[in-house]
Amino acid sequence: MKVFSNTHTFNYSWEEVSTANWRKYCPWNDKSTHVIAVDTLAREVDPATGILRTERLITCKQSAPEWLKSIIGGMETSQVFETSYVDPAAKTVTMVSQNITWANMVNVQETVVYRPLDAHRTQFEQDARITALCGGWQRIKSSIEDTLVTRFRENATKGKEGFECVLAMSRRVFAEEREKEKMRIEGKMMA
Protein backbone atom coordinates (compact mmCIF):
# COMPACT_ATOMS: atom_id res chain seq x y z
CA MET A 1 0.00 0.00 0.00
CA LYS A 2 1.17 3.51 -0.84
CA VAL A 3 -0.18 6.71 0.69
CA PHE A 4 -0.48 10.16 -0.83
CA SER A 5 -1.18 13.10 1.50
CA ASN A 6 -1.64 16.73 0.62
CA THR A 7 -2.72 19.93 2.36
CA HIS A 8 -3.51 23.38 1.06
CA THR A 9 -4.96 26.60 2.42
CA PHE A 10 -7.62 28.33 0.34
CA ASN A 11 -7.99 32.06 0.99
CA TYR A 12 -11.76 31.74 1.06
CA SER A 13 -14.16 31.25 3.95
CA TRP A 14 -15.48 27.80 4.77
CA GLU A 15 -18.92 28.93 3.60
CA GLU A 16 -17.51 29.87 0.19
CA VAL A 17 -15.52 26.64 -0.13
CA SER A 18 -18.33 24.35 1.01
CA THR A 19 -20.75 26.01 -1.44
CA ALA A 20 -18.33 26.06 -4.40
CA ASN A 21 -17.41 22.42 -3.77
CA TRP A 22 -20.62 21.39 -5.57
CA ARG A 23 -19.40 23.25 -8.68
CA LYS A 24 -15.89 21.81 -8.61
CA TYR A 25 -16.38 19.98 -11.92
CA CYS A 26 -18.18 22.73 -13.83
CA PRO A 27 -17.11 24.68 -16.96
CA TRP A 28 -15.44 27.29 -14.72
CA ASN A 29 -12.80 24.64 -13.95
CA ASP A 30 -10.72 24.18 -17.10
CA LYS A 31 -8.44 21.77 -15.19
CA SER A 32 -11.16 19.11 -14.80
CA THR A 33 -11.89 18.39 -18.45
CA HIS A 34 -11.30 14.69 -17.73
CA VAL A 35 -14.54 14.60 -15.70
CA ILE A 36 -17.31 13.48 -18.06
CA ALA A 37 -20.23 13.35 -15.62
CA VAL A 38 -21.14 13.80 -11.97
CA ASP A 39 -24.38 12.06 -11.06
CA THR A 40 -26.03 12.58 -7.68
CA LEU A 41 -27.40 9.22 -6.55
CA ALA A 42 -28.77 10.15 -3.12
CA ARG A 43 -28.96 13.17 -0.86
CA GLU A 44 -30.44 13.53 2.61
CA VAL A 45 -30.18 15.67 5.71
CA ASP A 46 -30.03 13.89 9.04
CA PRO A 47 -32.76 15.61 11.09
CA ALA A 48 -30.93 14.95 14.36
CA THR A 49 -27.49 16.28 13.35
CA GLY A 50 -28.21 18.55 10.37
CA ILE A 51 -25.48 16.74 8.40
CA LEU A 52 -26.03 16.67 4.64
CA ARG A 53 -25.04 13.27 3.20
CA THR A 54 -24.63 12.98 -0.58
CA GLU A 55 -23.69 10.02 -2.75
CA ARG A 56 -22.32 10.73 -6.22
CA LEU A 57 -20.97 8.74 -9.14
CA ILE A 58 -18.11 10.51 -10.92
CA THR A 59 -17.20 9.35 -14.44
CA CYS A 60 -13.81 10.34 -15.88
CA LYS A 61 -11.82 9.89 -19.06
CA GLN A 62 -9.00 7.49 -18.33
CA SER A 63 -5.47 8.87 -18.39
CA ALA A 64 -3.55 5.85 -17.15
CA PRO A 65 -0.27 5.04 -18.90
CA GLU A 66 -0.57 2.48 -21.69
CA TRP A 67 1.58 -0.10 -19.85
CA LEU A 68 -0.80 0.08 -16.88
CA LYS A 69 -3.90 -0.16 -19.09
CA SER A 70 -2.43 -3.28 -20.71
CA ILE A 71 -2.07 -4.94 -17.29
CA ILE A 72 -5.39 -4.02 -15.71
CA GLY A 73 -7.58 -3.40 -18.75
CA GLY A 74 -7.72 -0.77 -21.47
CA MET A 75 -10.97 0.93 -20.47
CA GLU A 76 -11.40 4.50 -21.71
CA THR A 77 -13.46 5.68 -18.73
CA SER A 78 -13.36 5.09 -15.01
CA GLN A 79 -15.91 5.59 -12.26
CA VAL A 80 -15.56 6.65 -8.66
CA PHE A 81 -18.18 6.42 -5.91
CA GLU A 82 -18.11 9.41 -3.55
CA THR A 83 -19.93 9.93 -0.27
CA SER A 84 -19.77 13.40 1.23
CA TYR A 85 -20.82 14.77 4.59
CA VAL A 86 -21.39 18.48 5.15
CA ASP A 87 -21.60 19.28 8.86
CA PRO A 88 -22.70 22.91 9.24
CA ALA A 89 -22.36 22.83 13.04
CA ALA A 90 -18.76 21.59 13.04
CA LYS A 91 -18.06 23.43 9.76
CA THR A 92 -16.53 20.46 7.99
CA VAL A 93 -16.97 18.93 4.57
CA THR A 94 -15.70 15.35 4.42
CA MET A 95 -15.63 13.44 1.13
CA VAL A 96 -14.76 9.76 0.95
CA SER A 97 -14.29 8.17 -2.47
CA GLN A 98 -13.59 4.69 -3.74
CA ASN A 99 -12.77 3.54 -7.25
CA ILE A 100 -15.32 1.26 -8.93
CA THR A 101 -13.37 0.71 -12.13
CA TRP A 102 -10.53 -1.80 -11.75
CA ALA A 103 -11.60 -2.43 -8.15
CA ASN A 104 -10.59 -6.08 -8.47
CA MET A 105 -7.03 -4.99 -9.39
CA VAL A 106 -6.46 -1.71 -7.54
CA ASN A 107 -8.10 -0.27 -4.44
CA VAL A 108 -7.99 3.53 -4.22
CA GLN A 109 -9.58 5.11 -1.15
CA GLU A 110 -9.44 8.88 -0.86
CA THR A 111 -10.57 11.14 1.96
CA VAL A 112 -10.78 14.91 1.61
CA VAL A 113 -11.66 17.27 4.47
CA TYR A 114 -12.31 21.01 4.34
CA ARG A 115 -12.37 22.90 7.66
CA PRO A 116 -12.01 26.58 8.53
CA LEU A 117 -8.67 27.95 9.69
CA ASP A 118 -10.27 31.29 10.48
CA ALA A 119 -13.11 33.43 9.09
CA HIS A 120 -11.34 33.95 5.76
CA ARG A 121 -9.30 30.78 5.14
CA THR A 122 -10.13 27.10 4.72
CA GLN A 123 -7.78 24.15 5.19
CA PHE A 124 -7.90 21.33 2.62
CA GLU A 125 -6.57 17.92 3.66
CA GLN A 126 -6.31 15.01 1.22
CA ASP A 127 -5.30 11.45 2.00
CA ALA A 128 -5.29 8.63 -0.57
CA ARG A 129 -4.46 5.00 0.13
CA ILE A 130 -3.57 2.99 -2.96
CA THR A 131 -3.27 -0.80 -2.90
CA ALA A 132 -2.55 -2.93 -5.96
CA LEU A 133 -4.22 -6.34 -5.70
CA CYS A 134 -2.13 -8.34 -8.21
CA GLY A 135 -1.39 -11.45 -6.24
CA GLY A 136 2.27 -12.11 -5.44
CA TRP A 137 3.90 -9.88 -8.06
CA GLN A 138 5.41 -7.38 -5.65
CA ARG A 139 7.43 -5.54 -8.30
CA ILE A 140 4.35 -5.00 -10.49
CA LYS A 141 2.25 -4.04 -7.45
CA SER A 142 4.85 -1.45 -6.42
CA SER A 143 5.05 -0.05 -9.96
CA ILE A 144 1.27 0.33 -10.16
CA GLU A 145 1.09 1.96 -6.73
CA ASP A 146 4.00 4.31 -7.50
CA THR A 147 2.41 5.32 -10.82
CA LEU A 148 -0.92 6.07 -9.15
CA VAL A 149 0.73 8.09 -6.37
CA THR A 150 2.51 10.13 -9.06
CA ARG A 151 -0.85 10.70 -10.78
CA PHE A 152 -2.40 11.82 -7.50
CA ARG A 153 0.45 14.29 -7.00
CA GLU A 154 0.05 15.70 -10.54
CA ASN A 155 -3.74 15.84 -10.26
CA ALA A 156 -3.55 17.52 -6.84
CA THR A 157 -1.80 20.51 -8.41
CA LYS A 158 -4.33 20.69 -11.25
CA GLY A 159 -7.22 20.21 -8.84
CA LYS A 160 -6.04 23.02 -6.60
CA GLU A 161 -5.62 25.41 -9.56
CA GLY A 162 -9.01 24.46 -11.00
CA PHE A 163 -10.82 24.84 -7.69
CA GLU A 164 -9.20 28.27 -7.19
CA CYS A 165 -10.83 29.31 -10.52
CA VAL A 166 -14.20 27.96 -9.35
CA LEU A 167 -13.87 29.79 -6.02
CA ALA A 168 -12.97 33.08 -7.71
CA MET A 169 -15.88 32.82 -10.15
CA SER A 170 -18.29 31.83 -7.37
CA ARG A 171 -17.24 34.83 -5.30
CA ARG A 172 -17.75 37.12 -8.28
CA VAL A 173 -21.16 35.65 -9.19
CA PHE A 174 -22.43 35.77 -5.61
CA ALA A 175 -21.27 39.40 -5.26
CA GLU A 176 -23.12 40.31 -8.47
CA GLU A 177 -26.27 38.55 -7.27
CA ARG A 178 -26.10 40.28 -3.86
CA GLU A 179 -25.78 43.63 -5.64
CA LYS A 180 -28.78 42.86 -7.89
CA GLU A 181 -30.85 41.87 -4.86
CA LYS A 182 -29.82 45.03 -3.02
CA MET A 183 -30.85 47.16 -6.00
CA ARG A 184 -34.16 45.28 -6.29
CA ILE A 185 -34.95 45.88 -2.61
CA GLU A 186 -33.94 49.54 -2.82
CA GLY A 187 -36.13 49.91 -5.92
CA LYS A 188 -39.13 48.50 -4.03
CA MET A 189 -38.50 50.85 -1.11
CA MET A 190 -38.47 53.89 -3.42
CA ALA A 191 -41.69 52.86 -5.18
Q: What residues fall within each predicted segment?
A:
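Hydrophobic ligand-binding cavity/cleft-lining segments
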Residues: 1-64
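Terminal "cap-and-tail" regions of soluble proteins that handle hydrophobic small molecules
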Residues: 2-7, 71-76, 87-191
